[in-house]
């Protein structure tokens, strides 16, 4: 390099020369030269800066030329580097006097480069003076500080983002006790914040769960825009504006970098490359180039990736995915977390898990390595196994995986092994979720084997750095998870090992490459679908789970495992955990399937007819006594409401069916006996039935045959006029009953089948013929039934839907199966009732007549209560048939004719109830005929009373 006048007559570095030289004629010649220089490179020269004692978590160039570089890390120190001096003469950095109590995560220069802000895990932001290295102020937070940004127009204003989910705006001129302005307050952590360089009222944030957002200071607590479209709820860890403030670059966990226009929620481009992965650590990104035409990001595969932003917005194709990096910078020996670009010198700085800061430049620097074509490959290293990491921690004598007490700038094997273990676990977790049929060891090898890394080969420091423990002869191939093909030439022991795992045949390499291609195709397909479809929300949520900043595991976790334990045992334990998880998931699926297949209840009838009462009536117990003292002492006619469309429990149904069946048999036999005995003699069947009832008389009561014939004639005439559907209603409303209250108790406890009280529901009939409803109404005293019916009519209508008379319901013939006890009871009753008309019941509503026999025996069918009467499949059946039976015997009533044979006027409420419930004209005519017949026979009844 020639000496130049005006430069002090001293030799200057390339960086200083490029920044200080003056070109006459075209002021843009320098930018054009540097742009062309970078565009023609396939690799960059690299050089390491040594000074930190631990991981370097934050780096920032100074403004207006990038003359200074500030760095901070796990050693809790803030170092200030003069770039020209550090590159040329290896001058030690300046340590600022303000020291944190824990890891440093973020740094920022003010616009004049006179102050430096640093924040970290100790929940505070320290303001440093660059010239004096003194601490100017401390700003306390409630949690760890992850991001810092200084206002581009006011050096007194800065923003901080912290783990407590708050973005705070601070003014350094305020008193230390003043409260900052809270711009955002979320339950999840903010990892990054940045002022817009052109519009300082706008800020961009990266949240661990809410993704990337744009904020306005004038509108706190509510973001202006949430980027990402339908996939906005993603775990974002870094966000950067370009120099014009028109675009945003963001990093997301387990997803490639994404570029947004600040006015659009949808991404402009996504950038991916084979081998790029971002999952294990918190990283940052930046723009590069004098026109921000490149982007930069570190990766978990120890490489630094540079993509070129296409000039055409449609260049990315489907999903706008830029697949293929412009440049892959290889040289780091562990994960790359931080990267910054200096637009004035085209210099790139990167750092991460290592203690070094690596400088990348298109110009050859003193003591640099590498070339611009990528033909020179450096040595790479093997990954430490988890057992080796535990062994290193235990043998070090310290319980920590990193120790800064010795203040060494050399590579720490424990720290490298710790993050190697993180990478292994992350890849193993990915392989367990993948549907690939390859083994885990193959997936581990292919993930790292394709990403060939250059070694850490600084001429001065590499000789003193300890090498990773070489794999022994007895190690399996799973332990030999290495980073690309290794050229091990420095250690004789390693070179003399015959069975080195670094050698692989062509078939295994081809297998690894093909598997990785399939994996990359799936990733690209998923990325394409994310931008154009809304069907990948679940997959995005799976990828956006919060990953905390890595902490070193406790040494007790692996204390029971000696350093000589093989990876097969580790795989065995992993397989056992997975098998347990699969068994637990399978058991849960079986339980869920069993719950889904479990029947929810008895089958319901799906056929619905007009007039069907579908109201869910309350269930009333069968044994409830009637509250009315004037009605039958046994039960009231309206004591049971059964929902038509819902079957009661089997036990209750069978009990009610048996009662109804017995009562019907007895009623049918007694009625047929009256109709067949026209000679005035009481039927033998009726006598046997009456003799079996407790509390009844055994004396015969002669009845004139003429009155029976008149009764049958009137019944036949009424049968012709009475509709089959409405016959039960008016017959029940007109028929009244009263019994001897003294005989109720004895009759209730009768042991005979026909003496049991009928509590209405259903009867099974023969499907070969139609069902005809039989209702017998024999009047003794019209007061009891009339009151029961009137109380029924006064109840409000239960269902808003229309009701047909009798509340019809279609019931299949098999709804009420007959049990063996029912068949035996039927056979026993058939011996008593020989004449049963082939099992068909004929509707013969009997009007109140004046014979003595009818005055003592009353069997009333209350037709207005819901129940079941099964018919043919095509004919609806009358529901809700209640059988209300009087307790008095015919002989007892004949012995006391004056007490039991008084006639009361019909209760008008009973007549009104029939009009309310049944509105058919045929029923009204039937009621009038019954009233006429009643008036004609009143004279004969009066004679009996006297």
UniProtKB/Swiss-Prot annotation:
One of its GO terms (cellular component) is mitochondrion. SUPFAM superfamilies: WD40 repeat-like. The modification Phosphothreonine is found at residue 500. Residues 555-567, 625-638 have a biased composition (Low complexity). Residues 531-544 have a biased composition (Acidic residues). Keywords: Phosphoprotein, Repeat, Ubl conjugation pathway, WD repeat. It holds the Pfam family WD40. Pathway: Protein modification; protein ubiquitination. One of its GO terms (biological process) is protein ubiquitination. WD repeats lie at residues 51-91, 99-139, 140-180, 185-225, 277-317, 331-370. InterPro entries: DCAF8, WD40/YVTN_repeat-like_dom_sf, WD40_repeat_dom_sf, WD40_rpt. Residues 454-465, 760-769, 808-819 have a biased composition (Polar residues). Residues 691-701 have a biased composition (Basic and acidic residues). Residues 579-592 have a biased composition (Basic residues). Residues 449-478, 527-656, 675-860, 894-946 are annotated as: Disordered. It comes from the Eukaryota. Is a substrate receptor for the CUL4-DDB1 E3 ubiquitin-protein ligase complex (CRL4), involved in the ubiquitination of a set of methylated non-histone proteins, including SOX2. The complex CRL4-DCAF5 is also involved in the ubiquitination of methylated DNMT1 and E2F1. PANTHER family: DDB1- AND CUL4-ASSOCIATED FACTOR 5, WD REPEAT DOMAIN-CONTAINING FAMILY. Interacts with DDB1, CUL4A or CUL4B. Interacts with L3MBTL3. Interacts with SOX2. Interacts with DNMT1. Interacts with E2F1. This is DDB1- and CUL4-associated factor 5. It comes from Mus musculus.
């Amino acid at each position: 390099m020639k000496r130049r006048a005006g430069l002090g007559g001293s030799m200057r570095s390339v960086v200083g020369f490029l920044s200080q030289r003056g070109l006459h004629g075209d002021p843009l010649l320098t930018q054009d030269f540097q742009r062309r220089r970078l565009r023609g490179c396939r690799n960059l020269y690299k050089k390491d800066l040594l000074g930190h004692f631990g991981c370097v978590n934050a780096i920032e160039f100074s403004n207006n030329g990038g003359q200074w570089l500030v760095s901070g890390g796990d050693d809790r120190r803030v170092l200030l580097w003069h770039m020209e001096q550090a590159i040329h003469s290896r001058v030690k950095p300046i340590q600022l006097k303000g020291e944190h109590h824990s890891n440093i995560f973020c740094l920022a220069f003010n616009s004049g480069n006179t102050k430096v802000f640093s924040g970290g895990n100790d929940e505070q932001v320290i303001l440093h003076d660059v010239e004096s290295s003194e601490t100017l102020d401390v700003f306390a937070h409630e949690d760890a500080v992850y991001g810092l940004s200084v206002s581009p127009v006011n050096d007194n204003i800065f923003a901080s983002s912290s783990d407590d989910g708050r973005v705070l705006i601070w003014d350094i001129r305020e008193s230390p006790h003043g409260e900052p302005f809270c711009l955002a307050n979320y339950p999840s952590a903010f990892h990054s914040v940045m002022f817009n360089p052109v519009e300082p009222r706008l800020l961009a944030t990266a949240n661990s769960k809410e993704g990337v957002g744009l904020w306005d200071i004038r509108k706190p607590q509510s973001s202006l825009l949430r980027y990402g479209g339908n996939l906005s709820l993603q775990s974002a860890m870094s966000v950067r504006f370009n120099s014009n403030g028109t675009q945003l670059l963001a990093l997301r966990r387990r997803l490639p970098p994404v570029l947004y226009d600040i006015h659009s929620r949808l991404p402009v481009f996504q950038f991916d490359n084979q081998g790029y992965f971002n999952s294990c650590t918190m990283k940052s990104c930046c723009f590069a180039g004098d026109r921000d035409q490149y982007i930069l990001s570190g990766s978990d595969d120890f490489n630094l990736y540079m993509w070129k932003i296409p000039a055409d917005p449609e260049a990315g194709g489907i999903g706008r995915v830029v697949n293929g990096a412009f440049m892959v910078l290889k040289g780091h020996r562990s994960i790359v977390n931080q990267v910054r670009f200096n637009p004035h010198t085209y210099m790139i700085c990167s750092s991460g898990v290592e203690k070094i800061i690596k400088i990348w430049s298109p110009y050859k620097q003193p003591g640099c390595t590498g070339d611009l074509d990528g033909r020179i490959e450096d040595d790479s290293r093997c990954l430490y196994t988890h057992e080796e990491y535990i062994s290193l921690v235990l043998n070090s004598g310290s319980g920590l995986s990193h120790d800064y007490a010795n203040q060494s700038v050399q590579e720490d094997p424990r720290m490298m092994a710790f993050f190697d273990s993180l990478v292994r676990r992350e890849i193993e977790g990915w392989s367990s979720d993948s549907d690939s049929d390859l083994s885990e060891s193959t997936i581990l090898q292919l993930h790292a084997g394709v990403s060939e890394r250059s070694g850490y080969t600084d001429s001065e420091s590499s000789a003193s750095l300890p090498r990773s423990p070489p794999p022994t002869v007895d190690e399996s191939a799973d332990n030999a998870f290495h980073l690309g093909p290794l050229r091990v030439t420095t250690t004789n022991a390693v070179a003399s090992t015959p069975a080195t795992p670094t050698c692989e045949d062509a078939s295994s390499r081809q297998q690894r490459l093909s598997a990785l291609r399939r994996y990359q195709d799936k990733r690209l397909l998923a990325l394409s679908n994310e931008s154009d479809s809304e069907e990948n929300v679940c997959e995005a949520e799976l990828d956006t789970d919060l990953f905390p900043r890595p902490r070193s595991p406790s040494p007790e976790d692996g204390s029971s495992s000696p350093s000589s334990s093989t990876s097969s045992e580790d795989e065995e334990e992993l397989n056992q955990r997975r098998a347990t998880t699969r068994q637990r998931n399978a058991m849960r699926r079986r339980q869920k399937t069993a719950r889904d297949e479990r029947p929810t209840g008895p089958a319901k009838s799906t056929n619905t007819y007009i007039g069907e009462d579908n109201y869910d009536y309350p269930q009333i117990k069968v044994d409830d006594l009637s509250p009315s003292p004037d009605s039958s002492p046994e039960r009231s006619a309206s004591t049971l409401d059964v929902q038509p469309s819902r079957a009661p429990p089997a036990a209750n149904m069978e009990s009610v069916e048996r009662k109804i069946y017995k009562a019907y048999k007895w009623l049918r036999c007694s009625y047929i006996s009256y109709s067949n005995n026209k000679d005035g003699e009481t039927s033998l069947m009726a006598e046997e039935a009456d003799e079996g009832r407790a509390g009844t008389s055994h004396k015969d009561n002669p009845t004139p045959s003429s009155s029976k014939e008149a009764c049958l004639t009137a019944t036949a005439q009424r049968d012709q006029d009475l509709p089959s559907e409405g016959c039960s209603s008016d017959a029940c409303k007109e028929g009244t009953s009263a019994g001897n209250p003294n005989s109720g108790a004895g009759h209730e406890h009768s042991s005979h089948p026909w003496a049991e009280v009928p509590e209405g529901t259903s009867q099974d009939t023969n499907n070969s013929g139609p069902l005809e409803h039989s209702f017998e109404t024999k009047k003794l005293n019209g007061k009891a039934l009339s009151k029961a019916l009137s109380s029924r009519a006064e109840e409000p209508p239960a269902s808003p839907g229309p009701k047909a008379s009798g509340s019809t319901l279609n019931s299949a013939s098999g709804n009420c199966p007959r049990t063996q006890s029912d068949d035996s009871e039927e056979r026993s009753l058939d011996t008593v009732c020989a004449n049963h008309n082939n099992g068909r019941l004929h509707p013969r509503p009997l009007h109140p007549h004046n014979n003595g026999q009818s005055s003592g025996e009353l069997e009333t069918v209350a037709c207005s209560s819901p129940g079941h009467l099964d018919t043919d499949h095509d004919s609806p059946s009358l529901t809700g048939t209640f059988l209300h039976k009087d307790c008095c015997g015919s002989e007892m009533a004949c012995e006391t004719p004056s007490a039991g044979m008084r006639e009361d006027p019909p209760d008008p409420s009973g007549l009104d109830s029939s009009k309310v419930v049944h509105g058919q004209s045929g029923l009204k005519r039937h009621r009038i005929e019954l009233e006429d017949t009643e008036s004609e026979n009143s004279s004969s009844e009066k004679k009996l009373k006297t």
